[in-house]
């Protein structure tokens, strides 16, 4: 299990809720068959999604707001 610091994640988005939603949506995409943007995917989709967000490989889609 990965335990990232909120300080590092707050550089991406200050809202914990928004980060949680972003990671969970990306994890769902990975479960549904989307390709990972990492060179080596982790076993768990949530861990992979979180690492993608931390490495800024995926970002929040604000077009629906």
From Swiss-Prot:
Q: What is this protein called?
A: DNA-directed RNA polymerase subunit omega
Question: Any idea which UniProt keywords this protein has?
Answer: DNA-directed RNA polymerase, Nucleotidyltransferase, Transcription, Transferase
Gene name of the encoded protein? rpoZ
Q: Which GO terms describe its biological process?
A: DNA-templated transcription
Q: Which SMART domains match?
A: RNA_pol_Rpb6 (SM01409)
Family that this chain belongs to? Belongs to the RNA polymerase subunit omega family.
Q: What does this protein do?
A: Promotes RNA polymerase assembly. Latches the N- and C-terminal regions of the beta' subunit thereby facilitating its interaction with the beta and alpha subunits.
Q: Where are the transmembrane segments?
A: none
Phylogenetic classification of the source organism: Bacteria, Bacillati, Bacillota, Tissierellia, Tissierellales
Catalysed reactions listed for this entry? RNA(n) + a ribonucleoside 5'-triphosphate = RNA(n+1) + diphosphate
Q: Which Pfam families match?
A: RNA_pol_Rpb6 (PF01192)
Origin: domain of life = Bacteria
Q: Does the record bear Protein transport in its keywords?
A: no
One cellular component term from this protein's GO annotations in UniProt = DNA-directed RNA polymerase complex
Alphabetically, the GO molecular function entries are: DNA binding; DNA-directed RNA polymerase activity
The answer to whether keyword Transcription regulation applies is no
EC identifiers of the protein: 2.7.7.6
- Quaternary structure note: The RNAP catalytic core consists of 2 alpha, 1 beta, 1 beta' and 1 omega subunit. When a sigma factor is associated with the core the holoenzyme is formed, which can initiate transcription.
